[in-house]
């Protein structure tokens, strides 16, 4: 099963594609999409949409996992992340893919086993769980891989409980 994890953002959107074979996870591809800083927001969102849609069509993941929007003190940041999430949801829906959403707490618990794990602990666990030599950079990429790992663990749990994905 191929799982595409996405860490939404309008300037930098991290993505990580992992393959789940049995109980093992393998990194397939990870990087980020970037948009030019002074480009109007509608154009940035359109650029991201085209990148995501093309990537999904090329790589053919089975599931898309994305981080849920959480309360942010910076309203402008929260709005732009929400817009980026909308683009992810739209692109996945247009390609007929199911989208699974996880809170930052769920991602931390799934990856590090502790909901208050810091960014460095999560990055180290992503590196270890995927057998990578180095921590993926930038942080958005490591976050996207963590989201994909979280979904892979959720698939295991749902399968054990008899739920279908």
Curated annotation (Swiss-Prot):
Gene Ontology biological process: DNA recombination; DNA repair
Record-given protein name: Crossover junction endodeoxyribonuclease RuvC
Keyword DNA-binding: yes
Pfam families, per database record: RuvC
Keyword Hydrolase: yes
PANTHER family: CROSSOVER JUNCTION ENDODEOXYRIBONUCLEASE RUVC
EC number(s) recorded for this UniProt protein: 3.1.21.10
Known cofactor(s): Mg(2+)
GO molecular function, one term: magnesium ion binding
Naturally occurring in which organism (per UniProt): Desulfitobacterium hafniense (strain Y51)
CC cofactor note: Binds 2 Mg(2+) ion per subunit.
Subunit structure: Homodimer which binds Holliday junction (HJ) DNA. The HJ becomes 2-fold symmetrical on binding to RuvC with unstacked arms; it has a different conformation from HJ DNA in complex with RuvA. In the full resolvosome a probable DNA-RuvA(4)-RuvB(12)-RuvC(2) complex forms which resolves the HJ.
Predominant localisation class: cytoplasm
Organism classification: Bacteria, Bacillati, Bacillota, Clostridia, Eubacteriales
């Amino acid at each position: 099963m191929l799982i595409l994890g996405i860490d939404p953002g309008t300037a930098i959107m991290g993505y990580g594609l992992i393959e789940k074979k049995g109980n093992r996870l393998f990194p397939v591809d990870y990087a980020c999409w970037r948009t030019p800083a002074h480009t109007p927001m509608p154009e940035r969102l359109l650029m991201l949409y085209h990148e995501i849609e093309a990537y999904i069509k090329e790589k053919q993941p089975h599931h898309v996992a994305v981080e849920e929007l959480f309360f942010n003190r910076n309203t402008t940041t929260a709005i732009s992340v929400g817009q980026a999430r909308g683009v992810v949801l739209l692109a996945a829906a247009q390609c007929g893919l199911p989208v699974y959403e996880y809170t930052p707490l769920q991602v931390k618990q799934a990856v590090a086993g502790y909901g208050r794990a810091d960014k460095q602990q999560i990055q180290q666990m992503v590196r270890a769980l995927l057998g990578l030599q180095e921590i993926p950079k930038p942080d958005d990429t490591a976050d996207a891989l963590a989201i994909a790992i979280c979904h892979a663990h959720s698939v295991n749990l749902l399968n054990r409980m008899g739920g279908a994905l």
